[in-house]
A protein has these predicted regions:
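Conserved, mostly hydrophobic/aromatic
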Residues: 87, 98, 142, 191, ...
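Long, acidic (Asp/Glu-rich), low-complexity accessory segments flanking structured domains
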Residues: 1-90, 103-135, 139, 157, ...
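Active-site-adjacent pocket scaffolds in enzyme catalytic domains
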Residues: 156-248
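Active-site groove signature of glycoside hydrolases
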Residues: 101, 136-150
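Active-site cleft segment of glycoside hydrolase catalytic domains centered on the general acid/base Glu
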Residues: 148, 153-158
Length: 342
């Protein structure tokens, strides 16, 4: 298949626009979508303090020996090495954004993973908005979470900024987004916001997206955990399966010269082999978003995108249930009001 061969070339900047017609009316949460875990960790500030939410032992050691703890945390907390626009070009469409207020950062908001980032929230979201302008048929999911030290005022200002920045590109949480419906409406952005009060105030924001992760450094345990979750049944709507490995503070302090990249690369072949055996869809074991660390060092994105072609081969020829005449008469836009996800 020509489109599949194109995916082998490395970059996937417009992969959604190339998907077969059979997938255009499938809810986005039934497609396989590549995502990056801790998407902003490529720009951690090694001079910033450890987060207040980190274990007390780590914070105490950081106060006493910052020149030792911070480089150590930097090596273990860095899980990506590409800027957001490059991640988009690779094919990433889900962004795990962990937002925080830096102690000495004034009113600006940053991101955090162990320590804080150099790039602000406004700078990062602006980069995504610029990229979307040149890729009008690509749809991204921005998952905002954690909100370390944010005040109510911070939340209000952040939500207002997101809505003003993306405007009509935002998919309403009251809809069931598909590629076709988003294209017809000019929508390109799903924003989940892990604060229920803000979600209730803004229909443009979606509730927090479930993220399955094993909290283990052993890839076999990660796979076993994800398999167990699959057997329990997938959530309705969007959800994430995390291939990311996790180390605790004690291990990090005892291995200051190692890093997450080495650990990830060692496990990647096993994790990607499991990923290649999955299939997207609304069934009990159906995959949706799959997140990984260091998304630029393997064929991760292309592998996940190809799972959608597996879905086409497994499905009946006719996917769209809307009569042809009806679809044409309304200019290809169906009613996708939320009801019973498929």
């Amino acid at each position: 298949m020509e489109d599949e061969e194109r995916l082998q070339l490395g970059g996937n900047p417009d992969w959604m626009s190339l998907l077969p017609a059979e997938l255009l009316d499938v809810p986005l949460w039934n497609l396989a979508i590549p995502g990056s875990h801790d998407s902003m960790s490529f720009c951690l500030d090694v001079s910033s303090p450890v987060l207040k939410s980190e274990p007390r032992l780590l914070r105490v050691i950081d106060m006493l020996f910052p020149c030792w703890t911070r480089p150590c945390i930097y090596r273990w907390a860095t899980t990506q090495q590409s800027v957001l626009s490059d991640q988009c070009d690779l094919g990433i469409r889900f962004f795990d954004l962990r937002i925080a207020r830096k102690p000495a950062g004034g009113r600006k908001l940053f991101f955090a993973h162990g320590i804080y980032t150099l790039i602000t929230v406004k700078e990062a979201l602006g980069e995504l908005a610029t990229w979307l302008d040149t890729h009008p048929k690509e749809i991204i999911i921005i998952a905002c979470s954690h909100f370390e030290s944010l005040t109510d005022e911070d939340h209000c200002q952040l939500a207002d900024y997101i809505i003003s920045l993306f405007g009509k590109k935002l998919c309403s949480s009251e809809d069931i987004p598909t590629l076709r419906s988003c294209w017809c409406r000019g929508q390109q952005v799903v924003v989940s916001y892990d604060d229920q009060q803000m979600v209730l105030q803004h229909p443009e924001l979606w509730t927090g997206i479930p993220y399955w992760y094993a909290d283990s450094s052993d890839p076999k345990k990660v796979i076993a955990y994800l398999e167990e979750q699959k057997h329990r049944g997938r959530p309705d709507g969007f959800y994430v399966s995390g291939l990311n490995l996790t180390e605790d503070a004690a291990y990090i302090l005892l291995h200051p010269l190692q890093d997450m990249r080495t650990l990830t690369l060692r496990a990647l072949s096993l994790l990607l082999r499991w990923a290649s055996e999955q299939q997207p869809g609304g069934g009990a074991g159906g995959l949706n978003v799959l997140c990984c660390d260091f998304v630029d060092v393997s064929h991760f994105c292309s592998l996940v995108i190809r799972l959608n072609y597996k879905k086409v081969l497994a499905a009946p020829r006719a996917v769209c249930t809307v009569p042809r005449a009806t679809a044409e008469s309304i200019g290809c836009c169906h009613s996708n009001q939320a009801g019973h996800p498929t």
